[in-house]
Regions:
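Hydrophobic positions on the alpha1 helix immediately C-terminal to the Walker A/P-loop
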Residues: 63, 67
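Helicase motor core with emphasis on the C-terminal RecA-like subdomain
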Residues: 2-6, 14-27, 31-35, 39-51, ...
Length: 315
């Protein structure tokens, strides 16, 4: 499938006074689409599947959120992380959008109330984890509703070609057969050519359009330093950026705890995050990282996917 260059024309794009442009301006507060967004929106509104590869921070979510609001009905959004679902729902609600989520962090009563609102047509975007979406009960329930779009965030998780493969995502390959009349938007910031082909084949048998607007982030600088005294080098690196938000990755849980304690003992506001921690402690540390300045998260690879924080200055 051909990729879209950032400078490609968009002959089927919404007109400047179209509902898509009005929602972009009035709901989300943007005067114009970014490169690629306009044609992706038009593609989904035309009922065509789309694989979208765009850098982080480039507005991937708008590519499905705007069609969701233009065409009505219910858009189902698949996301791998509860924290990401909650963040996106909160942001949409602030913009006045009827969005909600059913997830494992919420009580049965809250989830049941969300479903009742969804079934009554009061929710426009419903965020679900892949394992919840693909249950027989949920699929049957959604078949009774006007599902007009399915969006899959972090779509690279479905591909065995990539390092981020998640088994629960593999079940999403049945979506095309289960919802044959519903366009699917697959979105990722991380997919080489082999991974892109794998995603498109699994989600819509390759029958869709692929949009690649590039991977380069010119505001990111990569540097390599020879390891001599790792702890001293780390402290100097982080300390030289005092008050800035960052992430330090470690290979093991033990090393994560030790490094966080070391940095904290040296005046750095460092917090640990790994899968071996109590869930409440993990969530508390993530909330502090997301909401307060100058926090350095010391973590395993359990942390990071879907984190939307504009002031991260070091990794």
């Amino acid at each position: 499938m051909p990729a879209l260059s950032p400078d490609s024309p968009a002959p089927n794009s919404p007109a400047p006074d179209s509902p898509a442009h009005q929602i972009l301006r009035d709901v989300f507060g943007y005067g114009a689409f970014r490169a690629g967004q306009e044609e992706i929106v038009a593609t989904l509104l035309a009922g065509t599947h789309a694989l979208v590869v765009m850098p982080t921070g480039s507005g991937k979510s708008l590519c499905f959120q705007i069609p969701a609001l233009v065409q009505g009905g219910l858009t189902v959004v698949v996301s791998p992380l509860v924290a990401l679902m909650e963040d996106q729902v909160a942001a949409l609600k602030l913009a006045g959008v009827a969005a909600d989520t059913i997830n494992s962090s919420r009580s049965y009563e809250v989830n049941a109330a969300t479903w009742r609102r969804s079934a009554a047509g009061e929710v426009r975007l419903l965020y679900l984890a892949p394992e919840r979406l693909m249950t027989e009960r949920m699929v049957d329930a959604l078949h009774r509703l006007p599902v007009t779009l399915i969006a899959i965030d972090e779509a690279h998780c479905i591909s065995r070609w990539g390092p981020s493969f998640r088994p629960e995502y593999e079940a999403l390959s049945r979506l095309g057969a289960l919802f044959p009349e519903t366009p699917i938007a697959a979105l990722t910031a991380t997919a080489d050519a082999a991974t892109r082909n794998d995603i498109a084949d699994k989600l819509f048998d390759g029958k869709g359009r692929t949009f690649v607007t590039g991977f380069d982030r010119p505001n990111i600088r990569l540097a390599v330093e020879v390891r001599r005294d790792a702890k001293r080098q780390l402290l100097e690196f982080v300390g030289a950026r005092s008050g800035q938000c960052g992430i330090v990755y470690c290979l093991t849980r033990k090393k994560t705890d030790e490094t966080a304690a070391f940095l904290a003992a040296n005046g750095i506001r460092a917090l640990p995050y790994h899968a071996g921690m109590d869930k409440a402690d993990r969530n508390r540390n993530q909330d502090l990282f997301m909401t307060e300045p100058g926090v350095v998260m010391v973590a395993t690879i359990a942390f990071g996917m879907g984190i939307d924080k504009p002031d991260v200055r070091l990794v």
